[in-house]
Amino acid sequence: MARFKRILLKLSGESLMGNQGYGIDAERLSDYARQIKEVSEMGVQIGIVIGGGNIFRGLSGSQKGFDRVKGDQMGMCATVINSLALSSALGAIGVKNKVLTAIRMEPIGEFYTKWKAIEAMEAGQVCIFSAGTGNPYFTTDTGSSLRGIEIEADVMLKGTRVDGIYTADPEKDPTATKFDEISYKEVLSRGLKVMDLTAICMCQDNNLPIYVFNMDVVGNLKKVMEGEEIGTLVHP
């Protein structure tokens, strides 16, 4: 039996690059789609948010001279591109899914509402939420927190390239140690880079647990759903 009934899966755009420096790696995309299919077949209701950093990042764009609002809007469009790619990959292996956008852009995707999303998930469709919150100055992590809270998810699963939360960046500090679980309060007091401050505070205020794990290891998503402790749980 699955550990959670309804999840919000957050994937980073950068992870879709695989070993490339830009864009979408077809093999990585297929790996993700197969993992999502495994969990969907367990009867889990799945909502997904994907970042757009493999294509464009609004904040870095503003640092290069772009207007911040325009830059963030470009970033929102990047998340739509990634969402369409994942939708196509899921459809290719028989997973029914729906792309919902925070900004109206039919026929690319349907305009998001909580009720539309829940109805689709209860009918067995995977919902992919794109275009962030539809507003500038909000990260896709914050968008993930918002969507997770709105759809009444049991947990936000944050798929990353590391196997949890550490005292420091394990890719830079070999002495960093991993937390099996940690409170929202400690994440904030330690200044750990799990998600941005707004996203963490939203989860804390609405009691949405966060589970950070390595999505790049094939099979890990199913392991999380089966109850294996392979990441870090953030909770009250």
List the model feature ranges, each with a label:
Residues 1-236:
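C-terminal catalytic "cap/lid" subdomain
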